Structures are given as structure tokens and as C-alpha cells.
Amino acid sequence: EMNALRGIVKDGAGTTLYNYFTEFGLAQISVDFLLGTAGTLVQSKVREVLRAIEDNLLGESMTDVHALVSREFFDKLIAHPKTEEAYKFYAATGAQPLRQDVRRNFPFAGIVFEEYAGTVTLSTKATERLVPANEGIAFPLGTMDTFTTYGGPANLLEAANTLGLPLYARQHLDEKGRW
């Protein structure tokens, strides 16, 4: 599901099998927040992300925007001069950023930023970060069909013309079809 947010399909070794943006002829929208530059207007970058998502809803509606960001991105975001005050006064909402770990939820200018450090172990025994360093993935919440999962019937004779299930389990049959 994380790779679906990124628009790619990978195999167990981490090799990209499909890039949905190239497969469907879409342009991936990327916004450089320039968090290393003190003069960057971070709110304007956030609005750029929000407008890009709103412009591409294709008739859908949304309630919120959530962003899963890398550790490095989150650290730069909360240390940036344009967001530091907002993070410090985040305590007005009940959070205590000077005393508590609030990496799970920092709303700023219309996006809820969440530090996400998920990894996956590949078949090569190496690990791969699901959100690359200094990057993030923003997506809409509260839509009707954006994150719907569809399943089809298994490739089994007894599953033909049936509704798909999330998981199929069965014992291995011998060559004559016996258990």
C-alpha cells in the first residue's frame, strides 16, 4: 500500500516493476520545500501541495491532507524559522512539543505532517526505507474512492464466478487433484 502511494510496484528484491506515472502517461507532481533555505515561505509550499491535490481530485471531495515524511524532512520542517514558532506554540492544542514526542502529528497550514520511519526487508536481506530521506508523500483523506481495495477471485476452478476475497488458503493438491 505504501508503494501504491508512491505510484510504483516493486518485487521482493526492490526492483521497480511498474511506475504508474509512466504506465498511464501521468506527470508526478513534486514540490521542493527548500527547507535548507531560511527565507523559504513554507506556508506557500504547503499551499502548493494542497492546490495540486485539490486540482487532481477528479470530482472527488476530501476532508484533510496527510503527509508521511522522512525523519530528515520532519527535523528540517520543525527547525525551519518559518515553522519553528508554530511548532513551539503547538502546545495550545494540548501537545507539549518541548517535553513530549509529537512526531506522530504536527498540523501546519492545512497538512498534518507525520514522521514515518517504516522499512521493508527485501529478499536480498537488505532494508529499504518506504519514505526516502528528505522526502514525503502527501495524500487526501476523506475521499470516497481514492483508497478502495478491490479483489478478484483466486486462480482456482472452485473460485470461478465468485466474489473475490482478501486472502485464499488451501492445501497443495497432488497431480490427480487429491488432498
Segments predicted by a language model, with ranges:
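Extended, solvent-exposed, turn-rich assembly/linker loops in the middle of proteins
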Residues: 16-96
